[in-house]
Amino acid sequence: LLSFVASLAVVDSIGSSGKTIAQIGCATTAIAMMESYRTGTTIYPDAMSKKLSYSSSGNVYWPSNYKAVTNSSGYLTKIYEKLKEGKPVMFGAKKSSGAQHWVVITGYNGGSTLTASGFTINDPGSSKRTNLQHLLNEYPTIYKYFYY
């Protein structure tokens, strides 16, 4: 299992959006977790936000060293393969309203049949959502996922 240090800063703003990391910074915080693991150092969301670029509404422009997958076909198997390589996976899902949320998938502790509930997550917005199924219960549409 991979572990990270994560916190949502309340006052640090996202680009020129006027919104704070606590309000719209789940993607920034998830990238900070991913980069903390990749570099072996602790990178906090406020420091990460200064390294990233954002649209005027606060949407992040993804780091170029990350590969995006937008096809949800076979996503559990693909994510499992990345975890077996020792790489966490950043995962985004949406509500029917279009609202998005981002988490980091850190491991798999389910059985031999892959299920969303078997994937452990670090959720920058909730300590109660601890597996991928918890996220999909609230954000049922898979948006995309990233890995490095």
Regions found by a protein language model. Give the residues of each.
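Active-site-adjacent structural segments surrounding the nucleophilic cysteine of cysteine proteases
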Residues: L1-L52
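Low-complexity, intrinsically disordered short peptide segments enriched in small/polar/basic residues
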Residues: L2, L8, G18, K87, ...
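Short coil/turn linker and secondary-structure boundary residues
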Residues: I21, T41-I43, T70-G74, T130
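Extracytoplasmic/secreted proteins, especially bacterial periplasmic and envelope-associated proteins
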Residues: G25, T29-M33, A47, G74, ...
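Structural recognition of the beta-strand scaffold that forms the well-ordered cores
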Residues: G25-T28, P88-A93, V104, F119-N122
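Active-site signature of cysteine proteases
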Residues: E35, T39, S96-Y148
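Hydrophobic/aromatic residues in well-formed alpha-helices
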Residues: M48-K50, I79, L135
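...with weaker cross-activation on analogous glycine-rich loops/strands in unrelated enzymes
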Residues: Y54-S112
